[in-house]
Design a protein with these regions (language model features):
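Conserved P-loop NTPase motor module
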Residues: 525-564
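The Walker A/P-loop phosphate-binding site
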Residues: 122-151, 355-385
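Conserved P-loop NTPase motor cores
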Residues: 391-512
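Hydrophobic positions in the central parallel beta-sheet of the AAA+
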Residues: 185, 379-381, 427
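Conserved ABC ATPase signature
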Residues: 146-152, 161, 380-412
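Glycine-rich phosphate-binding loop of nucleotide-binding enzymes
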Residues: 127-217, 478, 500, 504, ...
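Helical/strand "switch-coupling" subdomains that flank nucleotide/phosphate-binding cores, especially
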Residues: 211-358
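Basic- and hydrophobic-enriched, low-structure N-terminal and domain-boundary segments
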Residues: 1-157, 171, 421-423, 487
Length: 564
């Protein structure tokens, strides 16, 4: 394809008319280069149409007349018709340095397809695929948050089957390859990341191989414990443990639970004093110190504990009723089992003698890697529904809420003590519409969603970045999309509020190209291509306009482009 600049010229776009064209050759979305003096201007074809009278406009005729001796011009003057291209200007380069597009493109400048990327590969550069419709590898600059002195937030969207999970795994692999000191916390809702890190299933890339086994996978509550007396009290209240003793009034219930917590702390202190002959302050006693033995002792003592009864009820007639219930074997057994079920979320010693880590232990691991300057930590929380036990969604939200709170607290503390360091951690929220949905119908999810939105707004300077993965932007809070500087848009968002959002953010011409993305599940398509639009500061071609890429179709192609 060859053409010449013709028609409207503006800082953001120009028109060109084709002078050479091979019938059937793809045009829309293709990258073009325009030589303008000592500058190379790169643009993208965003529209085209046939015009029957190229010389209808006086100014255009005048420009052509100046070049009437040119063979190309003579042909156009004779035909007076041609295919006009609308070209979006992306960047200008001079000697490998980006120049502002603050100059007019010369009329009749030559336009050609871009055949090779005009910049050399640099540090922190990686590839997920090729520019759409070309064989040119599309470079991305992937720097860790310590190097950048701030974190990036990512938004990845596309319908089921769009390839977003595979794309994210490739992106994480590249970040780890280029930034070995970067931390990752992955909240895995459906198990695909867990399988990739374990080397299970037939996947495009095994993250286990990339991290060479240096990662931690936790499946709450099996091997990860909650922590904190306030949270313990919250769970006791929510699970209504006192109902088994016929205690229903909120104040009475709270009094009983507070008393149980006090007795647990008191018994732990006694045990520690016996073991170490040391007095341990109450503030150093945590739920991490709970054991099954201590819990059984405290629960059994409640049967004949006058103070417990008086803490729950002030009136003697109610106290007598509670004493009677405490001595009912069936009722008391249910009460004890309810408490033990909650305690199981907090105890760190398992029945087989092995130990769990607490949420705080996991977050402290990120901090230690930063302070020591050692290799980053990669932690996967396997939050698949069938493994979260009892109150599935509610308990999953608790684990997510608590680990994100600890992460935020540690990030703020590190920043306040040492502004030269940040936590350098990327948090991946897979199936993010479960955690920060646009429409919420329960208090637990509302609290979690509000906190995540707060983190999106506040944590960049602390070195905590977020990656939101979802099927549709309209399924999550708009603030999350707006706060994400890096966006990956896969297929399936061509209608409704999602299409309107893309049009609003990227401009109406974006959809002209985006709608042409092939569906990898299309049985009539000979190539099972996975395509994405990428925008944000990680792209090289333009800092304002999105790149359109075709993702590598083979593991070998991905590895060859980035590891060889």
């Amino acid at each position: 394809m060859r053409g010449i600049v013709y028609g409207d010229i503006a800082p953001s776009h120009v028109q060109a008319v084709l002078t050479e064209y091979q019938e059937g050759e793809a045009i829309l979305g293709r990258l073009v280069q325009i030589k303008n003096g000592d500058k190379l201007v790169i643009g993208r074809v965003v529209n085209f149409y046939r015009r029957s009278d190229l010389l209808k406009d006086y100014d255009q005729a005048k420009h052509f007349d100046r070049r009437k001796d040119s063979e190309t011009t003579q042909e156009l003057l004779n035909l007076r018709e041609g295919i006009v291209l609308e070209i979006e200007l992306l960047t200008a380069l001079r000697g490998g340095v980006r120049e502002p597009l603050n100059f007019p493109i010369k009329h009749l400048s030559e336009v050609e397809f871009l055949e090779e990327f005009p910049l050399e590969r640099t540090a922190y550069m990686g590839y997920l695929g090729h520019f759409w419709g070309t064989n040119i590898k599309a470079p991305l600059i992937l720097q860790d948050f310590q190097t950048l002195k701030e974190a990036y937030h990512f938004f990845v969207a596309g319908q089921t089957g769009s390839g977003k999970s595979t794309l994210v795994q490739m992106l994480l692999a590249l970040y780890n390859r280029l930034n070995p000191r970067m931390n990752f916390l992955i909240l895995d809702t459906v198990g695909e990341f867990t399988a990739s890190f374990k080397g299970e299933r037939e996947l495009f890339v095994y993250l286990k191989d990339v991290w060479q086994g240096q990662m931690e996978i936790y499946t709450p509550p099996e091997d990860l414990a909650l922590e904190g007396w306030e949270l313990f009290t919250e769970l006791c209240l929510e699970n209504k443990i006192m109902k088994h003793l016929d205690v229903k009034s909120v104040d009475n219930v709270k009094g009983g639970i507070d008393y149980i917590v006090e007795k647990l702390i008191e018994r732990i202190k006694q045990k520690k004093k016996q073991q170490f002959s040391l007095f341990q302050p109450t503030e150093d006693i945590t739920t991490k110190d709970i054991t099954d033995e201590i819990v059984k002792e405290v629960i059994n003592d409640l049967k004949n504990d006058r103070n417990f009864v008086e803490r729950v009820y002030k009136m003697k007639e109610y106290q007598e009723g509670l004493r009677y219930t405490l001595n009912n074997p069936v009722r008391f057994k249910k009460f004890a089992e309810a408490i033990q079920g909650i305690v199981g979320q907090f105890t760190v010693v398992k029945p087989d003698g092995t130990t769990k880590k607490t949420i705080r232990d996991v977050v402290d691991g990120f901090l230690k890697s930063v302070l020591k300057g050692s290799s980053g930590k990669c932690v996967v929380l396997n939050l698949t529904l069938y493994k979260t036990g009892g109150n599935l969604v509610g308990m999953r939200s608790k684990y997510v809420r608590e680990i994100l709170r600890w992460l935020y607290e540690v990030g703020v503390d590190l920043y306040c003590k040492n502004e030269d360091l940040n936590l350098n951690t990327l948090v991946v929220l897979e199936e993010a519409h479960n955690y920060v949905p646009k429409w919420v119908d329960d208090d637990e999810t509302t609290t979690l969603a509000n906190e995540i939105v707060k983190y999106f707004m506040e944590t960049r300077k602390f070195g905590i970045g977020w990656m939101c993965i979802t099927t549709r932007p309209s399924n999550v809070r708009r603030e999350v999309f707006d706060q994400s500087r890096v966006r990956f848009i896969g297929i399936g968002l061509t209608s409704g509020p999602d299409a309107e959002l893309l049009k609003e953010v990227f401009g109406p011409e974006f959809l002209n190209i985006y709608r042409l993305f092939p569906d990898p599940s299309d049985p009539l398509s000979p190539k099972k291509e996975v395509c994405f639009a990428i925008s944000g500061p990680i792209t090289v071609l333009s800092r304002q306009n999105p790149d359109f890429i075709t993702v590598f179709s083979s593991k070998e192609g991905f590895i060859k482009a980035n590891w060889e």
